[in-house]
Amino acid sequence: MRTLFIYPEFPKTFWSYEKILELVNRKVLLPPLGLVTVAALLPQHWEMKLVDRNVREVTAAEWDWAELVVISGMIVQKADMAVQIARAKERGLPVAVGGPFASSTPDAPELDLADFKVLDEGEITLPLFIDAIERGEAGGRFSAEGEKPDVTSTPVPRFDLLELEAYDSMSVQFSRGCPFQCEFCDIIVLYGRKPRTKTPEQLIAELQRLYDLGWRRSIFLVDDNFIGNKRNAKLLLPALKTWQIEHGYPFSFATEASVDLAADDELMEMMAECRFDSVFLGIETPDAASLETAKKLQNTRSSLEEAVDRIGSYGIRVMAGFIIGFDGEKSGAGDRIVEFVSRTGIPAAMMGMLQALPNTGLWHRLEKEGRLIQEKDAAKGVNQTNLLNFVPTRPIREIANEYVDAFCRLYEPHAYIDRVTHYYLKMGLPRWQQYVPAAFGKAAPPSWTDVRALLIVIWRQGLQRDTRWRFWRSLLKVARHNPGVLEQFLVVLAHNEHFLEYRGIVTREIGDQLAALPAEEPVSAPQRELQRA
């Protein structure tokens, strides 16, 4: 069976980083890990090709070659997903769809033309799909019916199908699921609250496969909470450290984790020694009442500012997500987020207005309260250019204006340089470097592509723009007081090349949506009494 995998195009988002990727001559930040995992779960005698539409178009020759088209994507990719399904059907090809969008909203109109809907986790539903194909069936819908697979038998993804040089980072997955119950989160809906992990041997085999394919850059562990199962994470990390030492630390790692990481010094030390250089935290808001409303109680048990500082002291850069628009939220939430980010110095602070995602606790509550203003199948997903999809407890325009103002202030060029400088002056030194001499001696020098990118950033921020004096003062300050993090400091300064452009996108698109709101559109719901858990 000649199988063509297609990964739909993403809209521009906070994480698309186009301007940064242009500097380093790459197309996309991350590959479609889900599709290459599906490829490994299908019969290996099938012929396979993969096209990531974020990298390039599907060629006529590839359409002609295909006997089956497999498409997977997230809610934010649904528009292009529909286009690719239609193109396949125009050519008379059978289409199978799956992934987060199909699993959460299988009856969405964008999926109407698909022949097969392979829902939930593929370890369970792909065998059903394969059986249907082998029986000659022309369509079907396959669901796990709530069952969650044991991922210790999941094979190494087919990384060989990827155009590796197009990507800035690779992706691997160690765990699925999260033990917490944040009301707005769809991860526990898709993967459950009991984190399931691969074995250390499995993950090491995946890294070895990437290494054998020539990969030598960063790797993102896509786990939604890498420390959801701390015991198993601590079993993995010693094996990962040994592998890194034996191979001369070819990879740096980034991942996502809950804030309680900061309370576990042993875990942070182990991650730092494996060369984890960044972690994304869902901080959401500094307002404790809003955290309680959202059932994100793990963020209320200790100081969030201290958590950011403790993680940074291990040489692990904190990235963080923030949300505006919670029920009962008081005016000025945007200001409070900006103040928190400025005090902690978090360089990459992702902001967005709250979205009720299909099937989440938030969705069901708002549906019961009659406050949803969007059908389930019309959900847009989490993006920084979407208004809230429900009636909030304060005016939509007030929330949206606070959001745009806060986002623009966070990435104002002078403020950004000051914040990044503040962060890197207190950043801990990378712990892993002490093990490199015992392995391979000095680390490999940076490539010419990376050097050229940094020179362009220095030209723009240090000479061309009115940030020049602030740039050089900050550079000299970090070089003098914390030289071990100077390279990282420059790389993170470069990120604002993307955020500068994205500020304009956020302002324009949110403004257009506000202008399009009809006069009779409900702008706020009655204040609801905050319920303390």
Model-derived features: where do they sit?
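A C-terminal junction/extension of Radical SAM enzymes
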Residues: V51-V55, E145-P157, R317, E329-G352, ...
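Conserved beta-strand positions
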Residues: F5, I71, L221-D223, L281, ...
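Structural recognition of alpha->loop->beta junctions
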Residues: A108-L128, M270-S278, V338-M351
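Radical SAM enzyme core and accessory elements
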Residues: R2-F5, E47, E62, D377-A378, ...
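Radical SAM [4Fe-4S] cluster-binding motif and immediate context
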Residues: P155-M319, I324-E339, E367-K368, E375
